Amino acid sequence: MVEQLVERIQKKDLRAMSQLYQMYVEELSSVCYRYVPSDDDAKDVLQNSFVKIFTSMATFEYRDEPSFRGWLVKIVVNEALHFLQERKRLQFTDLHEATLLQMSDEEPEPDHITADELHQLISELPDGYRTVINLYVFEGYSHKKIAELLGIKEATSASQLYYAKQRLSRSIMKLINKKQ
């Protein structure tokens, strides 16, 4: 079904574009909100993403649904990163590599919080922390790839992840304590 939609979109079929939009808008909105929690900004980024998806479709070679989905997600992530960089909202803190090696990677067990609560806590992180944790945890990117995408050092990516986890850990503990 998806392959036929792609073929129809490549022939400029507006109904197929609408169907594809309806199929993926919810999932891609979730991806977008992980990076851009502001409602208006996220809607702009999502709209730009769909414009890019539809304009890039002419050269897209469909293989299978999972790779197509990955392509869609990659476009949304790149558009969100472009949005944040364009507005200079990504700020990064550098740590010396030796300091990074000494840091622990302990995380609390979030047994008592829901996925929605965790998503909310992540959305409250500063843009730089939130961006790196999303790229590393949800998109599965390495620090090297994150550094390339964001124009930062690998050590900076690692330190942002460390600080994001620390802050998230404190927020989770506060939430758990508040519930008890």
Question: Where are the regions a protein language model picked out?
Answer:
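N-terminal module of bacterial RNA polymerase sigma factors
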Residues: M1-E27, K144-K145, L150, N177-Q180
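Internal acidic/polar
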Residues: V2, L90-A115
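Sigma70-family region 2
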Residues: Q10-K11, F50-E65, R87
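Amphipathic, Lys/Arg- and hydrophobic-enriched alpha-helical face
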Residues: Y21-D39, S56, I122, S171-K174
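Structural recognition of an alpha-helix C-terminal capping motif at a helix-to-coil junction
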Residues: S30, D44-V51, P66-N78
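Arg/Lys-rich amphipathic alpha helix in sigma70-family domain 2
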Residues: T59, V73-D94, Y163
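Helix-turn-helix DNA-binding module
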Residues: Q120-T131, E139-T156
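Short, Lys/Arg-enriched C-terminal cap helix and immediately downstream tail that follows
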Residues: R130, K165-Q180
